[in-house]
Every structure is written in C-alpha cells, then in structure tokens.
Amino acid sequence: MNNFPACFSALILTITIACPVAVSQEQKPVDIGSRRELFVDQFLIEKLDKAWLQQGTPRDEGIALKFDKPWEGLFCGYVTIIQDGAVIRAYYRGSPKAGADGNSNESYCCAESKDGKIWTKPELTGFDHEGVKTNRVLANAAPITHNFCPFIDKKPGVPASERYKAIGGTMTSGLIALKSADGLKWEKIRSEPIISKAMVPFPYMFDSQNVPFWSEAENKYLCYFRVFKDGIRRIVRSESDDFINWTKPVLMEYTSGNNKSPIEHLYTNQTSPYFRAPHHYVAISARFMPNRRVLNDEQAKAIKVDPGYFKDTSDAIMMSTRPVEGKAHASIYDRTFLEGFVRGGVGAQNWVSRTNYPALNIIQTGPAEMSFYVNQDYAQPTSHLRRYSLRLDGLGSLHANYQGGEMTSKPFIFNGNALSINFSTSAAGGVLFELQDTTGKAIPGFELKDCQEQIGNEIDRIVTWKKGADLGMLAGKPIKLRVSLHDADLYSFKFHKP
C-alpha cells in the first residue's frame, strides 16, 4: 500500500505549486454567458499565484441502503440514482451469486426516497420471488440485467412513452436499448443492439456500467462506455442524434493541468452533466488496482468475502470534461486531482476487489448539500450502498491559505449584471474581486481596492464594489476576473440577473 509511484508525486506537485498557465492575447474570449463555473479544471485560469485548486472532501453519511433481499445479495452493483420530481430512485443490479456476466441470477432492482437519505423498497408487480412481491423492475432479461443503466430523456419532443431510456448488455449481445414511461415498466426499443461489437475498434468492451444521457449542452445523446486498450480498462465516447444510430467511439484521453495524466484502470466512468452547471460533465469513477492485494487469507475469511474477490483493490476518483468547448475538449477527461476522491474506509471490508464503486449521478439533498453514493462491502454479506455528501458545487475549489494567493482568469464574455459567488472563509479570511480588460488592466470602479471584502460562508452572494453591484455595462465585453483570497475557498461563480 505504500508503494506510491514517483511519477504520481511529480504530477501532483505540478498541481499544488503556483503554476501560471500561458494564454495568447489573441485567444478568442470564452463566452460563459450566465452559466455557473466550477473549480474542477484550469480551463478558465490564466495564472495562479500562491493559490491552487483543491479537491473537495466528501463526508461519510453512513449506510443509505442495504442489499439484504434474497434476490439482491453480495454482488449488487452498477447503481444509478435518478431524481424525478419529488421521487428519487436508485436502480441497482440484484445478484446473490457469483457468475458469468449476464447470467440468469441477475435482475434489476429499485429503491425510492423523498430526500436521498431514507430509502424504501417498493413492492412491484411482475417479478415476484417465490410468491412474494419484489422491488425488481427487470428480471429474466439477461444479459441486459448485468449492467442496466437508465436516464430521463430530456430531449425536447420525446414521446411520454419514452420519457425514460436505458441501455444494457455484454460484448456478446451489444448494448440493447430500452424505454419506459414511468421508470418501472420497461420494454426493448428494438431487439438489435444500438451499439454492437462490430462498431467498436477495441478487443474487449461493455464489461462495465455503460453510461448514456441526453446532453442539453451539446444537443445530442452521448454514451460513455468501457473498452480495453493495451490491457488497460479505458473509456470511449460515442454520439447520436436519435439514440439509435451512433458514431464510431472515440477513446478518451487524460490530462492533469498542462500535463498528461497517468493511465489507470477505470472500471466505471459515471460521467454525467453536473446538475447546477450542465456544461461540466463530472465523472466520479471507480479506479481499479488489479492484483494490488491488501488482505491476507485470514482477514478475507473473517469478513466472509467471496474467495474470488479480495485479491485486488479499488477506490473512487473524480474527473471532469467540457466537450461543449469544442472538439478538442470532447475526447479529454481533466484529472486535475489525481488523488483518491473516496478512499477505502477503516476495516478489511473496504479493501477488497470491486468495492468503493460510485453510483451514477449527484443529487441535491439539502439547501447547501449534495450527495452521491458508493457501492461498498462488495462480495460480502454486508453489501450496501453508502451516502457521501458535499456542499453544493464543492467538488473542488480555488483555495489559498492564511498567507493569501491570487487567480487571474483568461478573457471571457458574460451575460448578466451581477457576479454571484459560492464561497467560504475563516473568521480571519476573505475574498476580493477585480474586473480587468484583456490586457490585465483594472477597469475603473471595479478594482481590487474598491471591492467589498467577502467574508462568511454562503452558497449565493452578490459581490459589490464601492459603486455597487451592477455590471450590466460590461456584459458582452471581453474581460478578465482577478480573485485575491486568503484562508478561503471559492467553489463557483456565475454572472446573472438577480
């Protein structure tokens, strides 16, 4: 566990030191409109001086859902969380026995919640177990039930009968498409796969949770799915206008700031639009470390893990991608943070194969809180889904310590008349803002010295200067944003009309 590759240390150093990012003065300003910008990458950053991007720290909120029904069991996995109005649903594979991918023991189950914290299992008709109603939405549908992955189709004009869509399948079957009006009763869109083995130029594929969704930012369907390249579990991206006809998949590459990122086994990708900033696709992914054994035979026996599932280990990492910024960005995951996002917890049960796998999607669970979920204790009698929370937008932040630091953005154009920030300071800390022209010269009236220091902890605060908060006269004009902060974090910002 202590053999940390030297190359990782070198890459992480490039993130934590002040590292100016060069930009040409002729570069076309980015039009950010009134969208919210997160601090999970360096896309908008021109220069950092004694400030850095810092990964958020999820809080363990405990067990959300136990996989304790006879048709669920040790090998439950590939979880998707969907919020549909007042109802939140968790879809997950039920699999009480180990077996080949797509075996007949696999089904798909559903749990429901009103707040994302307390979950119940509905009694549904259609897939009884020994005469008892179950919470299964799919059964006797192998191999779809190996990795069924649903979403709400938000494409304008979609028929009510197809409001929900999903895919599932293995390399043998290809990815089969399904539809549903209510997310509970499903049928195939067609018998043939929408993405077949023949379409994918890699030797192995689909052995994972393969993620489809409608992108409001790109106005198309996307599918991020797993392949093997050079023996490594990798991710590819495919596009579609109609959910039936898909483009040749493109291999996703990884960067970390201005550097290439290590290529690691990513078992699941869990890429989805962030709900408060859908041009940011966030991927809380399962990082798999094959043959990196932690437990000895005695420890494995004590936790009753299946003997075939304790000789590797895994954790969760966080990536992001911005394909809306152009083709050059579409095939790149930004791994600004190479460190684990969710580490294995205390106890042998957290250090087995295929545990700590994140569920798909992040949801809001409080006025200032959002949650995601992680599949834990895999292949053990205690198999369950665990909830982790963060502050809204708290995946990453612009951070400076007590001594202080600064960030200067690249040129951008905004729409709106006020700057809203999500931030936190200590009692001694603070944040100041300055608006500049594209040469870096402060715009009169919006200089750092004229800004009211922002002190406190708020999700949405309007920044003011001595002359007020109105920025309408600068809307549509290229500007830069300078941020000076000490003992503080800035989680996001946006320009809008309050």
PLM segments and residue spans:
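Sec/Tat signal peptide C-region and signal peptidase I cleavage site
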Residues: 20-24
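Carbohydrate-active catalytic/glycan-binding domains of CAZyme proteins
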Residues: 25-498
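Bacterial N-terminal signal peptides that target proteins for export
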Residues: 1-11
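Bacterial N-terminal signal peptides
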Residues: 9-19
